[in-house]
Amino acid sequence: MTQTQPVGTLRLTIDDQGPQGQSRAVEQFHQGALRVIRPHYLDDSGQVSYTIIAIGGGYLGGDVYEQQFTVKDNAKALITTQSATKIYRTPQGPVTQYTEINVGENAVLEYLADQTIAYRESTYHQFTKVTLHPTSTFVMSEQITPGWHPDGKHFAYDEMRLHTEITDSTTGRLVLLDNLLLRPDSREGSFGWTEQYTHSGQMIVMGEGVDKQLVAELNEQLAAHPDVYGAVNFLSAPGTLLRGFIARTLSNRTEELINLHEHIASLLRGRWRGQEPVNLRKY
């Protein structure tokens, strides 16, 4: 992924050959500042759940992290984090995280991370490459929270860049190329950028069950939400059967964004797989 020596490396490969058809890790490698807690099964669906731990309490300037997740055909996995990712001052250069994700035929991956907290004078670059089979289900959510500032300033970080690519594994066609770039200092005030809101979120869902009716339903729910502002957009591309949606949201509280993302994930897992709602059991 990168020629720079990473501070933390994590690789997981998951199949469905465990006892009673449970999904399990057949390859697990970690080095440096990244670890995973022993797997859990949060319901009787056979979906395995892994929690990522970042040793050290926060990311520092110049740090590079690499993650690779592979979910083989028919396997089901949920990956989350133990706590928020904290980006401190980065005078030595940006913090960079590379993630590669591969999800096979009829496989499921829900990647529900805690918030990323960007403190003053910090720069964070995240590059995520996702390769999906058209019959797979992929859910990814993330939240960006401005860190504490002694002067009470909301947007004291320098730059946040979230670059995401999604490709069809059967045709090689690109379905999504998204580059979310936040540079608070390039804006005078918040008008036209985040209005009165301080926290931002995004959720990407790919699956056979996504259609324009579902997108319209989610937009109606967002419009009625008293504490979150946002929109959901349908994703598709010529030459591929992959389809999905991306939701962009704003709020003043991290919990509102996390609760919304977990609500959507629970709604879809219930409709598509008859599975119980998300319950990460962190608190």
From Swiss-Prot:
Signal peptide: none annotated. Residues 1-20 are annotated as: Disordered. GO terms for molecular function: nickel cation binding. UreD, UreF and UreG form a complex that acts as a GTP-hydrolysis-dependent molecular chaperone, activating the urease apoprotein by helping to assemble the nickel containing metallocenter of UreC. The UreE protein probably delivers the nickel. It comes from Corynebacterium glutamicum (strain R). It is found in: Cytoplasm. Belongs to the UreD family. This is Urease accessory protein UreD. The gene is ureD. GO terms for cellular component: cytoplasm. Keywords: Chaperone, Cytoplasm, Nickel insertion.
